[in-house]
């Protein structure tokens, strides 16, 4: 479960600060039961392990503040116009791909084409993205272009205007699902047919990124080595090399105790086996994902695309639902089965979202008396 705080009560969220030095190699353990897929493209990848491996070069287009709201200063800036039903993306002129070519408007449009073209078999296409005018028609093969993507200065310009059918409240926040937040190198991939893209070496072995690091070597399914991207728009990064290598969950404890890697992800279940390790800084990584209890109070009408409430459903009784919530000793379960690393949140919107979090909501703690009432 996620925390309603932006920090964990038992852990720091950063390592001790020291003077930054240039150079040095960092080894990172990627914990997984299976080899990573190696699809190094946001529009085609659906594997969390691939995302973890390519994070060193794969930078989001838009900068955000600590509540995930879009702000200026990223590879591109975004401006939402609710009245015009548009989002205007302005690309930073300093941004270049790792081969030295500039990031341009067509690269952003091309990302949408990869997602929506059925030949790519991308799993990123959603009804939320289809809120973009013309994306559904392109997806269905009724149009060869996406009418809702406008490039005022042409394909090689740095401005893109997205036209939407409807505006949504979450469009000012990263991860809203209605606005794609990555680009794809059209100049590099345009000669690869859409149906061959996912298996191409330009995706699997020699991908391009505009982030701080670029790929230097891929051992398929096992490791990826990264070196500084000399074209990075924010300047040369400090590390000389980063190597991300796969290890199995069973190997985590021993690798930490033997200092085999500089950085290792540790799951809650592994904590009892490694909490006594010496010479290691443990820091908290609080995700935005959480688990919740749901009640069946109706059914999904696929034809209408909507939920239909059933007033006679057993669980369509607020008092009954509250009684169940008060009768669940969640804190004790977490203490017993997650070493106290998991904990409750009082509301669906955690504190990380700033003003959107309602600090007055207390949630449901274990309280048999209230449950019986």
Identify the residue ranges that each predicted region occupies.
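Aromatic- and charge-enriched surface segment that lines or borders ligand/interaction sites
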Residues: 76-128, 313-315
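Gly/Pro-rich hinge or "lid" segments in bacterial periplasmic/extracellular proteins
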Residues: 175-237, 241
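A bilobed periplasmic-binding-protein/Venus flytrap-type ligand-binding module shared by bacterial periplasmic
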Residues: 227-232, 289-319, 336
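N-terminal lobe/hinge region of extracytoplasmic solute-binding protein
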Residues: 29-82, 208
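Surface-exposed binding/hinge segments that line
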Residues: 125-191
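Short, low-complexity disordered leader/linker segments with a strong preference
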Residues: 1-25
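Structural transition elements
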Residues: 343-373
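Ligand-site clamp/hinge motif
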Residues: 201-204, 229-274
């Amino acid at each position: 479960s996620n925390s309603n705080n932006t920090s964990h009560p038992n852990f720091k969220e950063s390592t001790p600060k020291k003077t930054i030095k240039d150079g040095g190699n960092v080894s990172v353990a990627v914990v997984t039961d299976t080899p990573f897929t190696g699809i190094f493209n946001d529009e085609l990848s659906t594997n969390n392990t691939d995302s973890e491996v390519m994070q060193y070069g794969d930078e989001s287009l838009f900068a955000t503040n600590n509540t995930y709201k879009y702000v200026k200063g990223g590879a591109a800036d975004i401006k939402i116009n609710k009245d015009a039903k548009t989002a205007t993306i302005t690309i930073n002129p300093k941004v270049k791909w790792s081969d030295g070519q500039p990031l341009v408007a067509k690269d952003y449009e091309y990302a949408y084409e990869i997602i929506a073209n059925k030949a790519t078999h991308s799993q990123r296409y959603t009804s939320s993205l289809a809120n973009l005018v013309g994306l559904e028609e392109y997806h269905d093969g009724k149009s060869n272009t996406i009418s809702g993507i406008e490039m005022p200065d042409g394909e090689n310009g740095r401005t893109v205007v997205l036209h939407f059918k409807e505006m949504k409240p979450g469009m000012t926040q990263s991860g809203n699902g209605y606005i794609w937040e990555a680009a794809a190198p059209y100049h590099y991939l345009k000669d690869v047919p859409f149906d061959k893209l996912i298996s191409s070496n330009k995706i699997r072995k020699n991908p391009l990124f505009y982030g701080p690091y670029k790929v230097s070597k891929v051992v398929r399914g096992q490791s990826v080595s990264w070196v500084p991207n000399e074209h990075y728009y924010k300047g040369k990064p400090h590390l000389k090399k980063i190597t991300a290598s796969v290890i199995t969950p069973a190997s985590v404890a021993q690798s930490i105790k033997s200092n085999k890697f500089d950085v290792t992800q540790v799951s809650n279940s592994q904590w009892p086996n490694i909490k006594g390790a010496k010479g290691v800084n443990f820091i908290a990584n609080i995700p935005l994902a959480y688990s919740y209890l749901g009640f069946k109070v109706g059914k999904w009408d696929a034809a209408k695309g909507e939920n239909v409430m059933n007033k006679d459903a057993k669980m369509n009784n607020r008092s009954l639902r509250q009684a169940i919530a008060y009768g669940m000793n969640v804190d004790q379960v977490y203490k017993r089965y997650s070493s106290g690393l998991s904990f409750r949140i009082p509301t669906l919107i955690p504190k990380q979202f700033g003003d959107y979090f309602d600090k007055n909501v207390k949630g449901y703690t274990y309280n048999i008396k209230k449950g019986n009432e």
